[in-house]
Amino acid sequence: MPDSRATTPPVVTPATVDDSLPVGAPEGPAAEHAVRGNGLDPTLPAVLTVTAGSKRRSRGRGVVFWLALVWLAVVVLVALTASWLPLSDPDKQDLVNRLAPPLSDGHVLGTDGLGRDILARLAFGARVSLIISVSAVSIGMLVGGTIGLAVGFFRGWFESVTMWALNVVLAFPGLVLLLGLVAFVGQSLTAITLVVGFLSVPVYARVARATTLAAAQRDYVLAARALGASNRRIMFGEILPNVALPVAAFGLVALGVVIVLEGSLAFLGLSVKAPDPTWGSMIAEGRQHLSTTTHLAFIPALVMFLTVLAVNFVGDVLRSRFDVRESRL
């Protein structure tokens, strides 16, 4: 009498897969027959191959992420401790040693057209760039995020009026409006920070509004409304935690944009006034000697490029990590 008990499917182990599909095994029907002979799904090797490739890409992305994070940590540390590091005075002129090449005696990265040490000016220029960019991004996130949260939550006429005003600001060419405001309020560190922060408010408000609209339709928010929770409790207890992370991740990406923006202002001579060094002003000064000493413009441009690249990569990884829509892809 035949056995009516159901057969137990074989357990799939790495050894089973390796034995069924050895390296160099034939593809096509022969390979499929070998796999079916062991009771395995013929699509399993392809799935395992895709998974292995994804793991390799993820591992490589993780290495680049940590390299970018280390570079940013070094830049921030140098900017914060520039006054205590064994560096030359960034404003001290030595006309005898002007335009010295890199690795010169006492000047690791050489000197500029006035004999000032490039390494010292890079370190102190990093401080100016980071102060302006971090402060401006913080202002934009705080003010714009609050506006976007309120607009997305209350809706109605308040949303219409507020978004109309923000769209009017966004309609102006950003660089032209920035140049006009800087020329009007002055070129102090505080003035430039406030102007750049003000111009970034509409962008953060739109991001916060879109995230708030999506979070307001979640089941836990609807449940809180049904239980009689106040608007304040729902806004700050339920919606704000879900809005803060995407806005902060977007702010990290925008940090690179602000660094380039400040560098552009300095290149045009509209950032902080001399003799305070900035990366953009160093590039502008090196432009005059491109035919003879290219390192004057190349070194600060390279430092700015690597910093912005690291900020963009870290911000993109964090944004995809905390963005619910992308984390499911």
What are the language-model segments listed below?
Residues L170, L181-V185, V196, A210-T212, ...:
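Glycine-rich helix-loop "coupling/hinge" segments at transmembrane-helix boundaries
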